[in-house]
Amino acid sequence: MACPARIHGAAVRDVPQRNEGGDRAVNFLAIDFETTGYDFGSANEPWQLGYARVEAGAVVETGEWFFDVEGAPERAHEADALGTLQSSFETWAPKLMGVRLVAHNIACERTILTRAAPLTKWGPWVDTMKLAKARYPGLPSYKLGDLCEMFGQVPVIDGRTWHDGLFDAVACANLALFLGD
């Protein structure tokens, strides 16, 4: 049985304007995977995929899927968790197809999606880390959390913080909007 994404009415703080003359009309889907990591030679499996959909310069929808894989945190094993990323492809993939995908340091997200569906064309892609480096060369750090702190883009989502797929996807969306102004 297909499980819908957990949709959230996350209290996402308004994104400050960096440049009032900027074009904020670009629509995109910011995504973030959380993975089990490589531990003692085991596979690095995604256990959470968070997303934030942006339309006309505002986060209009957020959600997440959990994947029930070995080595994942307890919440990935809840009753509404999906199987593996590959076995639940038809549930989550339509949300990501045919849209501009935004991620921070896209190598991880792009690799996971390509591994799950090698013949699927994902993207076009936008990397917020590359955008930040281009707009603000010489910063002491280009980590997502550090950039969001520097630019006042840290989301406010009850019970969530960094290294949570939903939280990081919303943070990435906020940062993309800020950098795109």
Predicted regions and their residues:
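Conserved glycosyltransferase catalytic-site signature
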Residues: 110, 128, 165-169
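Active-site catalytic microenvironments for nucleophilic, acid-base chemistry
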Residues: 116, 134, 150, 175-181
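Acidic two-metal-ion nuclease catalytic site recognized across multiple nuclease folds
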Residues: 6, 16-20, 170-181
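A charged, well-structured terminal subsegment
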Residues: 157-176
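Conserved beta-strand -> loop -> alpha-helix junction used to position metal-binding or nucleic-acid-contacting
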Residues: 121-133
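Conserved non-catalytic scaffold segment of RNase H-like nuclease domains
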Residues: 18-124, 138-141, 145-159, 163
